[in-house]
Amino acid sequence: MDPCKFRPSSSFDTKTTTTNPGQPVWNDNEALTVGPRGPILLEDYHLLEKIAHFARDIPEPFVHAGRASAKGFFECTHDVTGLTCADFLPSPGAGTPVIVRFSTVIHERGSPETIRDPRGFAVKFYTREGNWDLLGNNFPVFFIRDGIKFPDVIHAFKPNPKSHVQEYWRVFDFLPHHPESLHTFFFLFDDVGIPTDYRHMDGFGVNTYTFVTRAGKSHYIKFHWRPTCGVSCLMDDEATLVGGKNHSHATQDLYDSIDAGNFPEWKLFVQVIDPEQQDRFDFDPLDDTKTWPEDLVPLQPVGRLVLDRNVDNFFNENEQLAFGPGLVVPGIYYSDDKMLQCRVFAYADTQRYRLGPNYLMLPVNAPKCGFKKNHYDGAMNFMHRDEEVDYYPSRHAPLRHAEPASFPVPTRPVVGKREKTRIKKENDFVQPGERYRSWAPDRQDRFVALRRRLAHPKVSHELRVIWIDFLSKCDKSCGMKVANRLNVKPSM
């Protein structure tokens, strides 16, 4: 038996403590010193190894640092073969193993899970044709529509670089330059801004993807996760009480529920738009700051997601769990959504920086199907290979391409000038206004009350006027209520 062919695991455990290379450790309580009170000796290899390893823990992610994961399966319940040739979405009944990561977006690891903050909802499908990562949030929209502004919007929400205190005046200073962000604000500062826990939370793909059939027919797709136990959220006073007792209440709720056999479940729905019909809407379907109205684009059921197993090791299956929207499978592809296009690179590059270039070899990230590639070298390459050819093509190792028909991609021609420009159909105020008017009066009042952050001394009178102008364009009564609270006369 060649031990090099097997990854280290708990099956190699010994009855006694060892160093990383396997030498016995006869004392893990005291460092090696000259006498009982003398200086520590550098020859204490175990001490040096222990401290050096501890000091080299991987950094926490810049976003989605607070996270909880669980494993389970996805089962197709409805036939969608007319929309996609994805191997794991055939006729009803097919099951696919998954791992799901829930997270808070902005705040650091260990922050209360009751903070008003978007929540991440990421699913990794281990399909027979590779891994598919569906990354989303608990809101269907995002703050900006162009990925070039992603670092800026995250910096605006992150703590002040001088004081390291999160201050909302920075947010209210930045976002007026991007009125498309209003729609997400009407979610974040609404009653749904603080989910009760992860089990009672919606999930949305946010970006527009593409389903492709074997014949090459494409459809634009939006993904929706709906919890079978319903959506539940916390009011501010409830969040303060819950978070004060337990900073990790949502993580504990998820773990304890699965441990008790109360398995969380979500239904997956899609919205479908034929690209040939996209011009009939008063918004751009590729704009991730917009929702697709369900009365015009109804939800279609696809399947169900069940989480029935907790992770075995938090670090291995949570901290090292890496997602990226670039991971798609035959039958599912990207769209020209500007935010999605940037995320395809950004997420993978983040993982290479944080986990190393071979992060997809880590067991939690590796595909469960067969695979063959030629880029193995680099840090943390622990896969045993014994071939002589690591290039393509070669007559010594007759590897061949997959058939083009096995991975159809959209073939729509694209013509245009090279330019940096905004999309034509911005229409930033209609959908936030419709959402506001759909609320009961008390819910509207709670939303308006959260605008008290506009009273911060660093939010200038000019900024307050701009915000009131934007809110008035969404809904005149909303703008008037905020203006009255701030004692500011609206400009319209």
Swiss-Prot record:
UniProt key word Mitochondrion: no
Record field: catalytic activity: 2 H2O2 = O2 + 2 H2O
Top EC category: oxidoreductase
Cofactor: heme
SMART domains reported for this sequence: Catalase (SM01060)
Active-site positions on this chain: 64, 137
Domain of life: Eukaryota
Annotated positions binding heme: 347
E.C. no: 1.11.1.6
Alphabetically ordered keywords of this record: Cytoplasm, Heme, Hydrogen peroxide, Iron, Metal-binding, Oxidoreductase, Peroxidase, Peroxisome
Subcellular location: Cytoplasm, Cytosol; Peroxisome matrix
GO MF, any single term: metal ion binding
SUPFAM superfamilies linked to this entry: Heme-dependent catalase-like
Positions with biased composition (Polar residues): 8-22
Disulfide bonds: none
GO annotation (BP), single: hydrogen peroxide catabolic process
Chain residue ranges for the region called Disordered: 1-30
GO cellular component: cytosol; peroxisomal matrix; plasma membrane
Subunit structure: Homotetramer.
Function: Catalyzes the degradation of hydrogen peroxide (H(2)O(2)) generated by peroxisomal oxidases to water and oxygen, thereby protecting cells from the toxic effects of hydrogen peroxide.
Family under the similarity heading: Belongs to the catalase family.
Listed name of the protein: Catalase
Organism: Secale cereale
